[in-house]
């Protein structure tokens, strides 16, 4: 679905593949921020698929996490889901990982967050986090595509659009619940 992320994805890929990042073996950190259901995970999957790199998913703290990441002697993507929860007490550890001082090879760090309240040391240095993408309401194209793919009775399309239009926040989760309800009744 069209989540309005193509420009961001292309920019990230171009940066990752640039001579500066390749030759200097630089890590790249990005943040996808927004409430649940706005497309952060989908965007992460799209980016991972396009780069064709192994993906390490981190969703909880671990005592030897930095040692493990530093031991990886190949380029990879490190996806840290809900980073503000995963590293709630250990943001210094997160900084050390992204800095990559001891890395054998470069890493692309994707941090998803529901609330962007990470340490200023993380956000204040462009060498750590290069891009931040805010996810909000679904685009009209994403809404139409989802309805087209999932609504059984297409005559009820305008009814769903009316409900979605009245919402303050529209997410994939909310849209799915509405379409499911209409499909049931």
Which residues fall in each region the model found?
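Conserved nucleotide-binding/hydrolysis micro-motifs of P-loop NTPases
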Residues: 62-63, 84-85, 114-119, 137-143
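Pre-Walker A (pre-P-loop) alpha-helix and adjacent loop at the N terminus of AAA/AAA+ ATPase modules
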Residues: 1-28
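Walker A/P-loop nucleotide-binding motif
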Residues: 21-44
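Short glycine-rich substrate-engagement loop in P-loop NTPases that contacts/grips substrate
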Residues: 6-10, 43-76, 87-92
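Hydrophobic positions in the central parallel beta-sheet of the AAA+
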Residues: 30, 78-81
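Conserved catalytic/switch belt of AAA+ P-loop NTPases
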Residues: 84-131
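Short loop/turn elements that form and flank the Walker-type P-loop nucleotide-binding site
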Residues: 25-26, 72-74, 103-106
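C-terminal alpha-helical "lid" subdomain
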Residues: 124-185
